[in-house]
Amino acid sequence: MKKTELGMDGWIQDLSAKSLSWFPDKLPVEISEELIDCLEEKSMESKLNARVCLHKGPDSALQEMIICQRNDQAHPPKRHPLRDKTFLVLRGTLLVSIFNELGEVIKTWCLQPESKNKVFCVRVPAGVFHCDFALTGTAVHLETTLGPFSPKNDREYLWQDSPENLNRWNAIRNNLVLNNVKND
């Protein structure tokens, strides 16, 4: 990952992360509209998802992140065997779906901030296959889970990488988008 300044003081980039990521230089951490604006701007410029971590580092027991997720970046369903995960949307529309072991959608939520009769937060239990992606150009959400983060055993994907499974995932994603944009 190349070095990218967030545009605000108090943040150190994690150059080893897959997405643009920054950790706080010191605690306590404040989250402002200006910070979220900077995060969205960096995501748009780089064409990557971007996050600021509210915790000190990957070894922290509680992991909280403000994530700007792009709608052109959606990952296939996965589960975290030992950790729950909470999504609380701050901007845009974030779709969260859970799946059974066969890859069938069990339930879907369209998370939106300050919306009438809509859900803005959902917690996915440990061991449940799920996916999350932006329905709007970007969706900014607070994600909370337990640490420490371990990229080797943190997640299990529902399907192995293959062209057939990629086609299956794309069809499911397209169906989720169509059903939730119409009903929104």
Walk through the language-model features, giving the residues of each.
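Conserved short histidine dyad/triad with adjacent acidic residue
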Residues: 66-83, 126
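Short, surface-exposed charged micro-motifs
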Residues: 66, 86, 131-132
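Short beta-strand His + acidic residue motifs that chelate non-heme Fe in jelly-roll/DSBH
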Residues: 76-78, 96-98, 122-124, 130-135, ...
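Short strand-connecting beta-turns/loops that link adjacent beta-strands
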Residues: 59-60, 82, 137
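Glycine- and acidic-residue-biased ligand/ion/polar-headgroup-sensing regions
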Residues: 71, 82-102
